Amino acid sequence: MQQRVIVGMSGGVDSSVSAALLLQQGYQVEGLFMKNWEEDDGTEYCTAMEDLADAQAVADKIGIKLHTANFAMEYWDRVFEHFLAEYAAGRTPNPDILCNKEIKFRAFLDHAMTLGADFIATGHYARRAETAYNSKGEAYAPLLRGLDKNKDQTYFLHAVHGREINKTLFPVGEIEKPEVRRIAEELDLATAKKKDSTGICFIGERRFNDFLKQYLPAQPGKIVLDNGKEVGEHHGLMYYTLGQRGGIGLGGMKGASEGAWFVLHKDVANNRLVVGQGHDHPLMQSTQLWSEAIDWVAGEQNIPAEGLRCTAKTRYRQPDQACTVFIDENSEHGVRVEFDEPQRAVTPGQSVVFYSDEVCLGGGVIHHTNAPTPNFI
């Protein structure tokens, strides 16, 4: 009997080709287009209608049914409110990670199961291993890096539990992006030459600062140098991220060298932005970080007393960094991570993701690091 797969179709080339490949592999395939954001300003920032039309055109071309579902309420409650709270606290969140965990691999998966699916599929560049069992006897599928290392998206999928991965197929995870484009052109799919989406879907083409301002009141404050000297005013700490180069408004400052300016530290308590010159400024360097809650793909991870040796990324596309992970005795589910080499601009609110060779073990949100605090704070 044919197994039924419902593909999350976004109107992009990766999910389009995923659906086509699954058909070729003999599955009974249907598509589902998710609407995760309600337009409220009457303008076409988000291309949701265009994306739906593209998904429908592909579904018609390959001869499959396309369902639609509205998860805007779930998105607001489970993703967007957290996104705003993190920015309000001076951190820099990554909503794509939470969206995958709560919407694409929870709300969508649950909905697909009510439609009678055996599996869901997405256009992510990732792979899964055969079903395994953790120490509690729970079935899960280990998450593996995508074959195309330049496009691998496991960083964004690390918070998805292995039991959900066990119900998911990743057709394009087994091939490289140029091949995906070639297949789409060969099949004459409407999305063959469509640009990859960038940015967060609910912001679309808007300037990020303008969007954020609609939801959080800006709190301007002082810009200070690494010695505490005031040199200007910032528009609100939420608009800046650690390690950011430029966009600070200090170009041509009297008495300063011609070098670029970088965000070194956010003094949230005093609403001050600390800046300085030098790509590898000491205030941006850390060798340890702490995360208060880790999502392990297997639902668990044995961490010996001497620590777990693995590699980690603290941002997407960063080369793997050798590290040791320890249980943090001061938090119920947290870890402390020691890196072999100093790390630059590790950012609270972003995620640290752990790997053992090809296997993505899981990860968590960075709470704080041991980067030095400016001595005037």
UniProtKB/Swiss-Prot annotation:
GO terms for molecular function: ATP binding; tRNA binding; tRNA-uridine 2-sulfurtransferase activity. The record marks H124, Q350 as: Interaction with tRNA. It is found in: Cytoplasm. Disulfide bonds join C99-C201. Signal peptide: none annotated. It catalyses: S-sulfanyl-L-cysteinyl-[protein] + uridine(34) in tRNA + AH2 + ATP = 2-thiouridine(34) in tRNA + L-cysteinyl-[protein] + A + AMP + diphosphate + H(+). GO terms for cellular component: cytoplasm. CDD domains: MnmA_TRMU-like. Gene3D superfamilies: Adenine nucleotide alpha hydrolases-like domains, HUPs, Translation factors. ATP binds at G8, M9, S10, G11, G12, V13, D14, S15, M34, G123. Pfam families: tRNA_Me_trans, tRNA_Me_trans_C, tRNA_Me_trans_M. GO terms for biological process: tRNA wobble position uridine thiolation. The active site is at C99, C201. Keywords: ATP-binding, Cytoplasm, Disulfide bond, Nucleotide-binding, RNA-binding, Transferase, tRNA processing, tRNA-binding. Its EC number is 2.8.1.13. Residues 151-153, 315-316 are annotated as: Interaction with tRNA. HAMAP family: tRNA_thiouridyl_MnmA (MF_00144). Catalyzes the 2-thiolation of uridine at the wobble position (U34) of tRNA, leading to the formation of s(2)U34. Belongs to the MnmA/TRMU family. This is tRNA-specific 2-thiouridylase MnmA. It comes from Acinetobacter baumannii (strain ACICU). The lineage of its organism: Bacteria, Pseudomonadati, Pseudomonadota, Gammaproteobacteria, Moraxellales.
